[in-house]
């Protein structure tokens, strides 16, 4: 399996702690005039990231009260449900996010935070069967997904 590359970005100093996971939502209008905005906005919208380490560098920021802190991050794996026939370790898949049964107990795992529609992922690990029944009657497996 390929090694996951880390990168450096900036997040709010009050949020910066190892292990923090977050989903990057995009650039804010308040960032337009900032000198370091490219360092803050060097991530992909909708992707889930995990902080590995914190650097001493802190920059003034109009968005974050105590400034923005430099952190080393990696893309974080997501746990979700996929069709059982696609649940093969190290396979590359395009998750099916078309289900609209929002009242189904499995819905949050069928639409995990950080999975972007139309993007491919690698099944890094098959974790087992779905914890709840699918309202559509589909056979699902719980897996760990990594962005490709």
Swiss-Prot record:
Protein name: UPF0179 protein Mpal_0949
Family: Belongs to the UPF0179 family.
Superkingdom, taxonomy of origin: Archaea
